[in-house]
Design a protein with these regions (language model features):
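Metal-dependent phosphoesterase signature
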Residues: 14-35, 60-69, 79, 92-99
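Substrate-recognition element of Asp-dependent hydrolases with the DxDx(T/V) motif
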Residues: 37, 41-74, 83-96, 135
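Asp-based, Mg2+/Mn2+-dependent phosphohydrolase catalytic module
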Residues: 2-4, 8, 68-86, 94-124, ...
Length: 190
């Protein structure tokens, strides 16, 4: 596994991380992988690590999507980028107070339970602060891959920031994600 130590899985946010974010997307035909996603996932799998998707889908609670539409989009993501070993989806809204919606750690903990591994054996890659907060709360390693919707304070607060999904996977497989803050490929001064 070269440099991954006790890492056994990499979990990913869906929208804005693995696929181009289409707000409240219920149409599988609109699913487009992020640049480099296919190759990045292949590297993770070749390293012998499990993969999974952890995604907030509040469009269900808001009445903008059905559970079936979310499942249909997820099937398309799996066709293009999978197979994934585990899927966790939160259909709740921000005010619902559930334990699964990121930044709560519930979905990451559930994914780890399904995989039979400890959260500490997992890395989580996402594009917003709630992703990093969920991973941290679960005890997993977090990597932020900023997009235009990522706020500067979320970038500043993240311990590890990768320039894109491929770079995130390089950091994870290189075993450096617990050791450095990497911004745009440059190590932060000690």
């Amino acid at each position: 596994m070269g440099g991954t130590g006790t890492l056994k899985a990499v979990l990913f946010d869906r929208d804005g991380t693995l696929v181009v974010d289409v707000p409240y997307n219920g149409d599988p035909q609109l699913v487009r992988p992020m640049d480099g996603a296919v190759a990045a996932l292949q590297k993770v799998r070749e390293a012998g690590l499990a993969t999974g998707v952890v995604s907030n889908q509040s469009g269900v609670a808001r009445g903008l999507l059905t559970v079936d539409q979310v499942a249909s989009v997820n099937r398309r993501v799996d066709q293009l980028l999978g197979p994934f070993d585990v899927w966790e989806v939160c259909p709740h809204g921000p005010a619902d107070g559930c334990a699964c919606r990121k930044p709560a750690p519930g979905m990451i903990l559930s994914a780890c339970e399904t995989l039979g591994i400890a959260p500490e054996e997992t890395a989580f890659v996402g594009d917003i602060g709630a992703d990093v907060e969920a991973a941290t709360a679960a005890g997993s390693r977090a990597v932020l891959v900023p997009t235009p919707v990522t706020r500067q304070e979320e970038i500043d607060a993240a311990e590890v920031v990768a320039r894109d999904l491929s770079h995130a996977v390089e950091l994870i497989l290189g075993g450096s994600i617990a050791l450095e803050k990497d911004t745009a490929g440059q190590e932060a001064p000690a």
